[in-house]
Structure formats: structure tokens, C-alpha cells
């Protein structure tokens, strides 16, 4: 497991973030009680366009113009491209199924993985990427969630989602 965690650790503004794709996780309310002890965020992976989507949300959460006073909640808010915490939770909050786990340390990652089960993906980048197929279910879900029009490729989809996240910074 530690090898998978190391391979899915990314440096963003001189700080390390573990970004894991987990298939078939079981998410219940108990897991969210761990937010009081551990720093992490889980996002519904069905609506993540690419790992760059998560990295961009993390970068935006590092700004001084935050919507939430909790950095980890801010990541969810930014990833959802909304200014409302409740809306962000409704749109991208983790549910049982495929999730993206974001945290800073291996201990937290291992504790969360033990609680939610599922299959940790060896390559989170590949797992989170939306297929380049406009008829793909994940592609359609993301287009609908962000209200995008005339999107014909995954590259264009990712660009437009990142733009939606950036626009939030202008509104804060």
C-alpha cells in the first residue's frame, strides 16, 4: 500500500498531497467524524474530470480569498466550482462508490482506506481521467454538473472545468 501512496503523491506549492482513486468505497457518516482528528477530503470520483481538476482545486484553496475557514472543505468547494458549501457537498460530496481521497500523510490515507474499504487504484491519474468519449457516462455527468455546452473532447472538458473553478476566484 505504501508504494501506491508514494506513487500518487504530488507536490503542489512545496507541499505534498496524496491523491488516491478508490473504487467501490463504502462511505458512511462515521467517516466524516474522522475530519475532527485527521485532515482529508473525499470527493465523488464520478465528477472529477482529471487529476488536474483536483490539483487546481487545491491551488485555489490555498488563496487568501477562501469561502470556508477549513482548507479541506475549501478543496471541495473549489472543485465543485460553487460558492456554497452545502451545494458543494451535494454536488461532489463522497458517497459509496468511486471516490478520490486527498490528504497530506500516509497515516491518514491508511486510516481512511481501512474505514472505507474499496480498491485503491495503482494509478490515480489514469483512474480519475475522464475518457475521451462524449457518450461516456462520466463525460456526460461532468458536462451536466458544470452546465457546459458544445464540449467535444476530454481535453476541452478539462479546460472548461478548470475555467469554471478559476471563475470562482474572481467572484470571492
Task: Label every model-predicted segment.
Residues 1-13:
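Secreted/extracellular ectodomain signature
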Residues 94-172:
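Glycine-rich, aromatic-bearing surface loops/beta-hairpins
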Residues 15-70:
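N-terminal interaction modules that seed assembly of large macromolecular complexes
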Residues 10, 38-40, 71, 127, ...:
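Phenylalanine-focused residue identity feature
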Residues 48, 52, 79-82, 133-136, ...:
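Low-complexity, intrinsically disordered regions enriched in charged/polar residues
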Residues 13-16, 94-96:
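Short flexible coil/turn linkers enriched for glycine and charged/polar residues
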Residues 51-109:
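Ordered, amphipathic secondary-structure segments that act as subunit-interaction surfaces
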